[in-house]
């Protein structure tokens, strides 16, 4: 299954911190709840709560680095009622 592969890859990657892992696992958990889709539409508030990240700078840093390390794609939504779309990369 695709999420097992991403988990294996992430746990072997020494560049990722606990915060990166928590955010990535929160994204994977939400994807699993969406019937296994690799893409979710969610808000920063939900991801911060699920990953137990309490700091905005930490959240933004981790998300930016997960994008640059090619773990996820991020498509921001500038509509406060719509969440941003996050897609797990293969």
Where in the sequence are the language-model features?
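Short recognition helix of helix-turn-helix/winged-helix DNA-binding domains
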Residues: 1-50, 68, 81
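Winged-helix/helix-turn-helix nucleic-acid-interaction surface
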Residues: 56-90
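The DNA-contacting recognition helix of HTH DNA-binding domains
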Residues: 44, 55-56
């Amino acid at each position: 299954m695709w999420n097992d592969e991403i988990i294996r890859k992430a746990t072997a990657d020494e560049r990722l911190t606990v915060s990166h892992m928590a955010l990535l696992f929160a994204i994977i958990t939400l994807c699993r709840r969406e019937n296994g889709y690799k893409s979710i539409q969610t808000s920063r508030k939900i991801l911060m709560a699920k990953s137990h990240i309490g700091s905005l700078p930490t959240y933004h840093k981790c998300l930016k680095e997960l994008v640059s390390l090619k773990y996820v794609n991020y498509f921001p939504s500038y509509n406060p009622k719509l969440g941003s779309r996050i897609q797990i990369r293969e």
